[in-house]
Amino acid sequence: MSARVTAGSRPANIATGIPVLDHLLTLLARSGRFELALELPPADAEAEVADAGRALGDAFAPLLRADGAYGHGSAFMPADEALAQVALEISSRPLVASNVDLTEARAGGLRSDLAARFLEAFADSAGLTLHVRLIDGEDSRHVLEAIFKALGAALAQASREA
């Protein structure tokens, strides 16, 4: 398993084995203007999603804690009819607080509650308090796209120099 994150705008190089997760992480990288590389060994979807969250959390942690980095950020992002807000802050008590319930939804074959598992593993590994709010949206794929785009933009704010 390998993950690398740097500021920049090269295309993301992501291979999780789960196409919809690859797509969501590509949106995160694009909206945050990060150069993102992630490769995971094959496993079941639940393990791959958690591994991806942990690996990216570990990769983002140094950027978020660098001298002069803001350490907090927030963003609203749309995806078609969906609108999501993500706010985050470096924390010694990582957690995810969300009003999004997609436990029954599927997006591209991915159980959407696996996206919640990704966010929890990511926040824990990066050491973040992460708040996710769905403002509007019906289509589960668009909701997930809006969330991951907002996460990328909020991470960009948090990792940039103050």
Protein language model annotation of sequence segments:
Residues M1-A162:
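Structural preference for solvent-exposed beta-strand-turn elements
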